[in-house]
């Protein structure tokens, strides 16, 4: 199992698929890395030589922000918005949708599980 950027890459998958296990590397960046290092896209991770793994590791470390650094940057951006007190920061602070979605109905992912209103019972006739 190859270890790149602190992540164990599955050995039986293709290189472009395996690189996507790293936070911050998606389909496009994985294909770009393979193209720049001239690694065939259909090659499996277990078929890579130690030299190729080292080249991948060096390229990712030098040119891409991944894993811990990227997570920290995203968290700091959100914290900055909250400290500014701007609209987006307030929405983050309150746990509501940030990008203008409706909240009267829906938005359950961001707001959490719906809680029934206690004490509101059906009136008997």
UniProtKB/Swiss-Prot annotation:
Query: Any keyword Magnesium?
Result: no
GO process annotations (BP): translation
Q: Which domain of life is it from?
A: Bacteria
Q: Name one GO molecular function term.
A: tRNA binding
List, alphabetically, the GO terms of the cellular component aspect.
cytosol; small ribosomal subunit
- Which UniProt keywords are given for this protein, alphabetically ordered? Ribonucleoprotein, Ribosomal protein, RNA-binding, rRNA-binding, tRNA-binding
Question: Do you know which InterPro entries this protein is assigned to?
Answer: Rbsml_uS13_C (IPR027437), Ribosomal_uS13 (IPR001892), Ribosomal_uS13-like_H2TH (IPR010979), Ribosomal_uS13_bac-type (IPR019980), Ribosomal_uS13_CS (IPR018269)
What does the record note on quaternary structure? Part of the 30S ribosomal subunit. Forms a loose heterodimer with protein S19. Forms two bridges to the 50S subunit in the 70S ribosome.
Q: Please report which protein family the annotation says this sequence is part of.
A: Belongs to the universal ribosomal protein uS13 family.
Q: Relate the protein's function as given in its record.
A: Located at the top of the head of the 30S subunit, it contacts several helices of the 16S rRNA. In the 70S ribosome it contacts the 23S rRNA (bridge B1a) and protein L5 of the 50S subunit (bridge B1b), connecting the 2 subunits; these bridges are implicated in subunit movement. Contacts the tRNAs in the A and P-sites.
Name of the featured protein: Small ribosomal subunit protein uS13
Native organism is Gluconacetobacter diazotrophicus (strain ATCC 49037 / DSM 5601 / CCUG 37298 / CIP 103539 / LMG 7603 / PAl5)
